[in-house]
Regions:
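Bacterial N-terminal signal peptides
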Residues: 8-20
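N-terminal leader/linker segments that initiate helical-solenoid repeat arrays
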Residues: 23-67
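Terminal, low-structured helical/coil segments at or just beyond the last alpha-helical repeat
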Residues: 176-214
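Hydrophobic face of amphipathic alpha-helices that form TPR/SEL1-like repeat modules
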Residues: 35, 67-74, 78, 103-110, ...
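Short helix-capping/linker turns of helical repeat alpha-solenoids
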Residues: 58-61, 74-76, 81, 94-98, ...
Length: 214
């Protein structure tokens, strides 16, 4: 099972709630106040947070829909609510939010709240992967799609495609150890000619998406 929390969460944890959502700062839950051990990085949002976020989500804001889905899935309002998480991930993903698309792909891959389907997982990972830049769900989608190609799940096993998506998931850096390790795993299965082919596909992809990168 792959982590579904969007990378933008780390910004939330470091600098506070997203300004665009105008959420209140997370409140320490009663269990924490009572001295019960709890993950200090796990956000806890108030009812006011939920009300504000839900209002924005209902008005069609894709980012708010994604955050609402994450909150329901992770239990940030108290108890996890997978059906509502799935509902809002689908709405946000349909609007093109890459974090939601990647998370929806992972729900299909893991069979969380839905019938497991590697085919649908690949579909949503691919949608996330096509976004530029590669931060957050786009980069995660590329890595996850690469893993499906590496393992032959939902798509034919294809080391060239796996290598290509792993390379793209790294963006302009190699400082993502798990993704770099995945790239190495694919390369070990390939001939030099196949690696050259994959590198060529990476450059072709970048050219096709050049306008989005500017």
């Amino acid at each position: 099972m792959r982590a579904r929390i969007p990378l933008s969460l780390f910004a939330f944890l470091l600098v506070g709630p997203l300004a665009s959502l105008t959420l209140c700062a997370p409140q320490a839950p009663t269990s924490m106040q009572a001295g019960v051990k709890r993950d200090p990085l796990e956000p806890q949002w108030s009812e006011d947070d939920r009300t504000q976020l839900l209002a924005k989500a209902k008005h069609g804001d894709a980012e708010s829909q994604m955050w609402l889905a994450s909150a329901y899935e992770q239990g940030w309002f108290g108890k996890a609510n997978i059906p509502d998480a799935l509902k809002w991930y689908k709405k946000s993903a349909a609007k093109g939010n890459p974090d939601a698309q990647n998370s929806l792909g992972q729900m299909y891959e893991d069979g969380v709240g839905v019938k497991q389907s590697y085919v649908l997982a690949a579909k949503w990972y691919r949608k996330a992967a096509e976004h530029v830049p590669d931060f957050g769900g786009a980069g995660q989608g590329r890595n996850n799609l690469g893993l499906l190609y590496l393992e032959g799940r939902g798509v034919p096993r294809d080391y060239v495609q796996a290598y290509m998506w792993f390379r793209l998931s790294l963006g302009n850096t190699s400082k993502w150890p798990p993704r770099a390790s995945n790239l190495s795993s694919a390369a070990q299965q390939m001939t030099m000619a196949e690696i050259d082919e994959a590198e060529h596909k990476v450059e072709e992809w970048k050219i096709r998406h050049h306008d989005q990168q500017d």
